[in-house]
Amino acid sequence: MIDTKQLIKAGEEKMTFAIEYLDEQLSHIRAGKANPKILDCVKVMYYGAPVPLTNVATVTVPDARTIMITPWEKKIIRDIEKGILDSELGITPENNGEVIRLGIPPLTEERRRQLVKQCKQEAENAKISVRNARRDAIEALKKSIKSDGVPEDVEKDAEAEVQKIHDKFIKKIDELYAAKEKEVMTV
């Protein structure tokens, strides 16, 4: 006898992963104000190896339009600057020899619309992942139920449970997208 709860839980875990991934991707999209997460993709050459910026410097946000980077070793300040320029963030670093300041320029209307499109694409990718997880869970349920000769009503109940979980996650994706869209479009 199969445990339908286990199969449903496995599908739910895949859906949860899709939501967490979407949340992370949306946090990397800048919304006109300083957010240190936009620097997560920056790699710095440190003793010949690329390492994340946060491994070689402290990143702080002194005000809404500035990110300040304080390297732990002063000699790598040029490497940090190069890493920021190479990451194509569209932000020019200001280096005073001690710290690097990144002035976050206000977003133009056109750039805001591009970012909203990017957010929408990320949300759509998450929805696809959730739908695939639902499909996989339902297929696993059908396969297991068919091989064990379980009554049809148990199968229908399990499918309904998977669908309910799916709908909850799709709603959550829509909420995350709407919140990010509002954040990006707010001047």
From Swiss-Prot:
GO molecular function, one term: ribosomal large subunit binding
One GO cellular component, as annotated: cytoplasm
Family under the similarity heading: Belongs to the RRF family.
UniProt name for this protein: Ribosome-recycling factor
Gene that encodes the chain: frr
Domain of life: Bacteria
One Gene Ontology term from the biological process aspect of the record: translational termination
NCBIfam families: frr
Keyword Cytoplasm: yes
Species the sequence originates in: Parabacteroides distasonis (strain ATCC 8503 / DSM 20701 / CIP 104284 / JCM 5825 / NCTC 11152)
Signal peptide coordinates: none
Annotated localization: Cytoplasm
